[in-house]
Each structure stands twice: as structure tokens, then as C-alpha cells.
Amino acid sequence: MLTREEVQHVAHLARLELTEEEEIQFTEQLADILAYVEQLKELDTEGVEPTFHVLDAELPTRPDQVEPYPNIEGILANAPDRADMFFKVPRILEGED
């Protein structure tokens, strides 16, 4: 069973601030989703070919082109930490600097 503390932990990792009501709501909703996934794990899928797309459709592509973004300050205004025009995030890998 999913606990409220686990939801708080995941919210913290995602840098989300949840109200008490949201914590309760998400705990219930995520517990329901996880219970459904457990039901799916019990299904016998032996011999069932994996489905990647329901419809045979290809997404249109375009050439990669560098284009200036018009509102960089607007995006960076939501960053918990930044250095000049970049998001600053905690180091997660050890080794090379």
C-alpha cells in the first residue's frame, strides 16, 4: 500500500509543493493505479505480441533548427536555482568535473 510519506518523498524529489489535501488525493489515486497495475501483472500474456502503436501512424518530422526562444526569463523565473541563463541542478554523478 502506498503511504502519504512516499507521496511526500516523490513530490520532494520532483520539487513539487503539495497541500495536505493534494497529498491525500494523490495518495489515494496513485494507490488505485498501483493496484490496477498489480492486476495487470496477473494476466497471462504468453504468446501475445507486444503492441507499440494501436494505429499504424507516423509522426511528421522536420529538420532540427536552432531558434531563439522569446521568453527565456519567463521560464527561468520558475527555476528553484539558476546560473545566468541556465537551470542549476544538484550534482548526481561523481567523477569528472
UniProtKB/Swiss-Prot annotation:
Top EC class, one word: ligase
InterPro entries: Asp/Glu-ADT_sf_sub_c, GatC
Swiss-Prot/TrEMBL catalytic activity: L-glutamyl-tRNA(Gln) + L-glutamine + ATP + H2O = L-glutaminyl-tRNA(Gln) + L-glutamate + ADP + phosphate + H(+); L-aspartyl-tRNA(Asn) + L-glutamine + ATP + H2O = L-asparaginyl-tRNA(Asn) + L-glutamate + ADP + phosphate + 2 H(+)
Record key words, sorted: ATP-binding, Ligase, Nucleotide-binding, Protein biosynthesis
Single GO molecular function: ATP binding
Biological processes per GO annotation: glutaminyl-tRNAGln biosynthesis via transamidation; regulation of translational fidelity; translation
Entry's EC annotation: 6.3.5.-
HAMAP family: GatC
Quaternary state and interactors: Heterotrimer of A, B and C subunits.
Function: Allows the formation of correctly charged Asn-tRNA(Asn) or Gln-tRNA(Gln) through the transamidation of misacylated Asp-tRNA(Asn) or Glu-tRNA(Gln) in organisms which lack either or both of asparaginyl-tRNA or glutaminyl-tRNA synthetases. The reaction takes place in the presence of glutamine and ATP through an activated phospho-Asp-tRNA(Asn) or phospho-Glu-tRNA(Gln).
Recorded family membership: Belongs to the GatC family.
Protein name: Aspartyl/glutamyl-tRNA(Asn/Gln) amidotransferase subunit C
Organism, scientific name: Synechococcus sp. (strain JA-3-3Ab)
Record gene name: gatC
